[in-house]
Amino acid sequence: MQGLIQKSGYIKSGGGAGGYAEYIATRDGVELLNRSGQYMEYIAERPRSHGLFTNAEYADLEKTMEEVNSHTAPVWTFIYSLRREDAARLGYDSAASWRRLLLAHQAELAEAMKIPPSQFRWYAAFHDEKHHPHIHMMVW
């Protein structure tokens, strides 16, 4: 995708991956995915609401933090960023649109990272920054 900026890194086992998950899920500017009815109201108003999403319908931040903290191999981190005008032009200016993109390409990403698709795990959060909307993604 033209104009896409990628930054990559990793967190070693025992290196605080759960804290990183909490940071990307709860920092200022994170967008909550729309959910229907009373459940959305519950999500938006409950303590520790977050914008974490994954391939499942709901991402549980506490369970995610426990899972990545107990993971014994590196957790890979990615930031994908676009300029505001490119995000608007391409339609990647919401958490839902980024989630659809990641869902469409998760098998390719698993293959590229040499992770069996059945074992591939990922979580992400969309940060709607003024000049560069972006996602933070964790993969293991």
Regions found by a protein language model. Name each.
Residues 1-133, 137-140:
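N-terminal nicking endonuclease/strand-transfer module with a His-rich metal-binding environment
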